[in-house]
C-alpha cells in the first residue's frame, strides 16, 4: 500500500494492518472461524435465500369447535371437538396425525422413560371414545392408530390440495395433579380448587414443507401446532370463573350485571379495576354454567377455572389506536398478584410498540398450578412468587404470545428459539418497566447468579458437558435447559444487537423478521439468513461459534509500538490477538501520553486472515495504554490479557 493511501485511510479513523505474526497460544484458526456456515436447509420456492417465506410458501390450517365439561368431582374433562383440517400442501394426504399429549402421563409413555426417573403420579391418558370423519350430514366412524402421544387416522381416500377434512372426536381424560402435571394440572386452595387446563383436546400435528408430517412424541417439552380459528365452550359449576384464551362472547349469560359494568369500566381504564373481589367469592352453587370463547388466528387455546378467583382488569393501549384488556385471576392468598395486571399491561404495550402489535383482544395471567407456562394470550404463573419474580414471569410468559404464538417456531425441535427470543425481549422490558423497578433482569432465565451476564455465561461455555444451542430440545437435560435454551440463546441476541450489529441495524431487521413470519413456521436457518441479508453482514462466525458450538472468546492486547519512522504520520500500532475460536466486534480504548483517550471500534474481520493484527492509531501523542472491552460488554474468558501498558 502506498503511503498516501495509508494516510487517506488513517484520516477517516483506524484501519487494521495485517501483521506477519500468528498467535503463539490458543486454538484460533481464521479459516475455521470464518468458514461459510452450513444452514442445514437449502433455499427453495417455499423458503427463500434471504430468509423470507418463498413465493410458493404454504402451510395447512386447522379450525376447531370444542365443547367440553370440567367435572371437579371426578377431576376430569370430557368433550367433543370438531376439527376442520385444510390441506394447502401441493400433495394429497392419505393420513392425518394428531397430538394427544395427555398420554404423556400414562405409565407406558415414552416421556416417563425419557425423564430418567419415576414421576409422582400417573393417569390413564386421553381416551378417544369416538372418532368420525364427517361428510356432509353423515359421519363415518374411523379407527385411529394410537402411538404414545400421537394418533394416526387413515383416510378412506387421500385429501387433495385445497380440500378440507372434518373430524369429530369425543374424548375424556383425568386432569393430572400439581406438581407432577407440569404444564397443566389442578391444586387445592382455601377457596376451592384451581384448574390450569392445557393440552385438553386432540390437536392436529403439523404437515410442512420441511419434513411432511412432524408428529414428534411429547416428552414433556413443548409444541408445534397449526394455525386456525377456535370456537370453544367450557361447562363448569355455576359459581366458578373461567379465564380463557381469546374473547368471552357470552358475558350476559355468565356474569352478573355488576361484573359486566366493572368490565366495561376496565375497558376504558389505564388503572386496574377489580371485577370480582375477594369478598365476593362465595361458596357452592347448584347447577352448571357454560363459558363460550372465540379466538382467531391462533395455534392453540387454554383456560383456567376456579371458584376461588379474584379477577381484575385494565385497558391495553395498542398500536394503530387499538385497545384490549389485560386481566389477572388469582386466589386472595396470592399476595404479590395485586399488580399482575399492571405488569401484564405494560409488557404487552411495550412489546407491541417495540416489536410487533399484539394480535388478540385480551391477555390473561393466571395464578395456579403449572406455574411459568404459556399459551396464546394466556399465562399460568405461580401463586407464591415474590413481587420481582411475579413481574419477571408475567412478562416472560405473556411475551410468548410473540414467540412462538405469533411467530410459529417448532418448539419441540428448537425450544431455544421461542425461549431465547422471548427472554431477549424480557431483558429490555425489565430495564424499562416503571423506570427500572425490577431491572436488570436477573432470574433463573438470565444471569441467575445476579452478576454481569457476559461473566455468568463463561462457565457454561467452558463446560464440555454443556450442549450447544442448536440441539434438539428433547436431548437437553434439565441441568442445561435454562442455562442454554434460555440464557445463552437470549444473550446471543443481546450481543448481536448491542455489540455486533447495533440497535440501528438489529431492531429493523428483527421487526421485519417477525412481520414476515407472523403466523407462519420459520426455522433457525430462516432466521440466520434473514438477519444476514437484512443487516448486510455475513454472520457465519457468530452462528457457528455461539449457536452451533460453545466456542470461547479470548482477545488480548500484546504490544504497543510507534509507527515506523518512514511513515509521514505520527501514531502507534496496538497489537491485538485472538487466542480462542470465537471472535466478535470489540471496543479498544487507547490512552495517550498526554492523558487523553479514544475508543476505537474493531470489527470481527480484524481477525479474518490472521490471529494477530496491528491496529494503527494516528496521534501526535503516543499510546501508553490499550484496553480491549473496557466497559465489560463481551464474554472474554481471560480479561487479564485485555489491558496492556508501556509504563
How would you describe each model-predicted region?
Residues 27-99:
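Early extracytoplasmic/domain-onset interaction patches
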Residues 108-122, 172-230, 251, 632-647:
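Glycine/proline-rich low-complexity spacer/linker segments in large multi-domain proteins
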Residues 30-41, 45-47, 61, 293, ...:
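Hydrophobic alpha-helical and helix-loop surface patches within well-folded domains
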Residues 26-28, 76, 86, 114-190, ...:
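A surface-exposed beta-strand-loop module
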Residues 202-208, 212, 219-395, 424, ...:
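Hydrophobic helix-coil surface modules that form long, contiguous segments used
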Amino acid at each position: 500500500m502506498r503511503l498516501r493511501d495509508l494516510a487517506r485511510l488513517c484520516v477517516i479513523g483506524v484501519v487494521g494492518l495485517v501483521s506477519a505474526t500468528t498467535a503463539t497460544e490458543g486454538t484460533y484458526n481464521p479459516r475455521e472461524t470464518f468458514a461459510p456456515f452450513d444452514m442445514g436447509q437449502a433455499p427453495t420456492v417455499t423458503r427463500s435465500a434471504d430468509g423470507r417465506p418463498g413465493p410458493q410458501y404454504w402451510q395447512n390450517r386447522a379450525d376447531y369447535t370444542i365443547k367440553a365439561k370440567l367435572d371437579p368431582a371426578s377431576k376430569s374433562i370430557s368433550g367433543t371437538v370438531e376439527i376442520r383440517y385444510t390441506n394447502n400442501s401441493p400433495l394429497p394426504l392419505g393420513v392425518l396425525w394428531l397430538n394427544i399429549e395427555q398420554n404423556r402421563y400414562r405409565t407406558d409413555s415414552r416421556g416417563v422413560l425419557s425423564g430418567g426417573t419415576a414421576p409422582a403420579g400417573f393417569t390413564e391418558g386421553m381416551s378417544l371414545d369416538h372418532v368420525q370423519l364427517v361428510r356432509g350430514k353423515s359421519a363415518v366412524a374411523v379407527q385411529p392408530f394410537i402411538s404414545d402421544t400421537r394418533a394416526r387416522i387413515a383416510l378412506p381416500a387421500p385429501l387433495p390440495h385445497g380440500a378440507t377434512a372434518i373430524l369429530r372426536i369425543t374424548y375424556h381424560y383425568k386432569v393430572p395433579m400439581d406438581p407432577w402435571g407440569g404444564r397443566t394440572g389442578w391444586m387445592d386452595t382455601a377457596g376451592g380448587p384451581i384448574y390450569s387446563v392445557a393440552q385438553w383436546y386432540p390437536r392436529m400435528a403439523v404437515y410442512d414443507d420441511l419434513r411432511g408430517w412432524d408428529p414428534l412424541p411429547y416428552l414433556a417439552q413443548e409444541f408445534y401446532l397449526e394455525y386456525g380459528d377456535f370456537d370453544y365452550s367450557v361447562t363448569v359449576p355455576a359459581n366458578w370463573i373461567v379465564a380463557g384464551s381469546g374473547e368471552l362472547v357470552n358475558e350476559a349469560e355468565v356474569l352478573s350485571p355488576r361484573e359486566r359494568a366493572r368490565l366495561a369500566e376496565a375497558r376504558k381504564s389505564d388503572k386496574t379495576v377489580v371485577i370480582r373481589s375477594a369478598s365476593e367469592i362465595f361458596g357452592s352453587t347448584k347447577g352448571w354454567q357454560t363459558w363460550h370463547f372465540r379466538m382467531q388466528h391462533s395455534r392453540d387455546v387454554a383456560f383456567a377455572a376456579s371458584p376461588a378467583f379474584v379477577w381484575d382488569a385494565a385497558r391495553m393501549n395498542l398500536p394503530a389506536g387499538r385497545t384490549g384488556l389485560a386481566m389477572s385471576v388469582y386466589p386472595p392468598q396470592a399476595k404479590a398478584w395485586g399488580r399482575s395486571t399492571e405488569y401484564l399491561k405494560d409488557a404487552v404495550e411495550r412489546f407491541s410498540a417495540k416489536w410487533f402489535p399484539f394480535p388478540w383482544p385480551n391477555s390473561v395471567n393466571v395464578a395456579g398450578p403449572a406455574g411459568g407456562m404459556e399459551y396464546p394470550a394466556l399465562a399460568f404463573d405461580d401463586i407464591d412468587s415474590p413481587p420481582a419474580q411475579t413481574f419477571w414471569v408475567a412478562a416472560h410468559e405473556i411475551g410468548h404470545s410473540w414467540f412462538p404464538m405469533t411467530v410459529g417456531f417448532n418448539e419441540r425441535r428448537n425450544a431455544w428459539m421461542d425461549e431465547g427470543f422471548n427472554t431477549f425481549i424480557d431483558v429490555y422490558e425489565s430495564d424499562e418497566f416503571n423506570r427500572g423497578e425490577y431491572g436488570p433482569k436477573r432470574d433463573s432465565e438470565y444471569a441467575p447468579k445476579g452478576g454481569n451476564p457476559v461473566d455468568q455465561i463463561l462457565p457454561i461455555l467452558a463446560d464440555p458437558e454443556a450442549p450447544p444451542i442448536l440441539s434438539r430440545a428433547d436431548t437437553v437435560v434439565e441441568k442445561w435447559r435454562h442455562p442454554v435454551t434460555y440464557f445463552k440463546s437470549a444473550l446471543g441476541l443481546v450481543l448481536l444487537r448491542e455489540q455486533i450489529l447495533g440497535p440501528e441495524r438489529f431492531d429493523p431487521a428483527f421487526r421485519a423478521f417477525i412481520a414476515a413470519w407472523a403466523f407462519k413456521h420459520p426455522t433457525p436457518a430462516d432466521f440466520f439468513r434473514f438477519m444476514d441479508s437484512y443487516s448486510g453482514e455475513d454472520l457465519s462466525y457468530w452462528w457457528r461459534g455461539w449457536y452451533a458450538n460453545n466456542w470461547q472468546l479470548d482477545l488480548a492486547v500484546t504490544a504497543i509500538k510507534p509507527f515506523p519512522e518512514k511513515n509521514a504520520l505520527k501514531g502507534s500500532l496496538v497489537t491485538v490477538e485472538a487466542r480462542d475460536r470465537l471472535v466478535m466486534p470489540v471496543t479498544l480504548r487507547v490512552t495517550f501520553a498526554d492523558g487523553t483517550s479514544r475508543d476505537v471500534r474493531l470489527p470481527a474481520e480484524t481477525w479474518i486472515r490472521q490471529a494477530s493484527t496491528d491496529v494503527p492509531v494516528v496521534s501526535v501523542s503516543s499510546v501508553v495504554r490499550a484496553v480491549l472491552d473496557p466497559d465489560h460488554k463481551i464474554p472474554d474468558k481471560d480479561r487479564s490479557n485485555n489491558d496492556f501498558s508501556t509504563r
